[in-house]
Amino acid sequence: MKRQFVHTEDGSTTLYVPALNEHYHSIHGAIQESLHIFIRAGIEFYLQTHSTGFPLSELNILEAGFGTGLNAYLSLLYAEKQKIRLQYHSLEKYPLTFEEIQQLNYKTQIPAKNPDLFDRLHTSPWETENLISPFFRLDK
């Protein structure tokens, strides 16, 4: 499948698929979109509304479409910061090539103690559970 790189308004990259006339993330900001929708309105909202007097320490996530790995990367960084164990399941029909992954600029756009974790998400084997960090397991 042919994909083109697009720089979004927040400076991050995303992909565009001409055959589908579809972007992987918002052209107004890939990182901003993922932070707002996946982290704040997703994970944080769930943790705030499903706590029963005790903070949740573990969460399972299913993502349909691993894509650029941005949602998984932000979730991983969130889990590390909040010390919450995430079991992350992701499906992907058209995985990115190594060359495409290297052209994404998330490691330079998102401050992280260990930006190499982004590469681990992408280089971990498919169809198996992968321990990416003590707080993040990936099954893709």
Q: Could you tell me what each predicted segment is?
A:
Residues 1-59, 76-110, 136:
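Rossmann-like AdoMet
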Residues 38, 66, 91, 118-119:
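Aromatic-residue hotspot detector
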Residues 62-64:
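Conserved beta-strand/loop positions that form the S-adenosyl-L-methionine
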Residues 69-73:
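Glycine-rich SAM-binding Motif I of class I
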Residues 100-140:
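S-adenosyl-L-methionine
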